[in-house]
């Protein structure tokens, strides 16, 4: 069971995502960028769904804070369909994006794909570490 942090200030969207994901995953909720960073810093998060426009710290500030510590999957949520802005978030380290209003099947599929890809990378990273020389 993956732990998914949903950072979204709209309580209706939070509830929709919690209902969608909670059957197969543990969902942790944050309603501002500042709260999202705090919950992320508590550890154990496997994936982040991150709104772009948030009170406190906005989505790009939260993304930068996460990328300073981790490479876990981050999927941006946006009501904006500005391709240039979306491209910039992808270049800044987001793994994917979903435009609101979203299709629930698409959200579930994108979350599943990102979690699967993340799980596939972990054994390779462990293997790389094990192959390092013991005495540096």
What are these regions (language model features)?
Residues 32, 58-61:
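Acidic catalytic/metal-coordinating carboxylates
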Residues 51, 78:
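Active-site residues of response regulator receiver
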Residues 38, 60-72:
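Short amphipathic alpha-helix used as the core "switch/output" element in two-component signaling
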Residues 84, 102-115:
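C-terminal output helix
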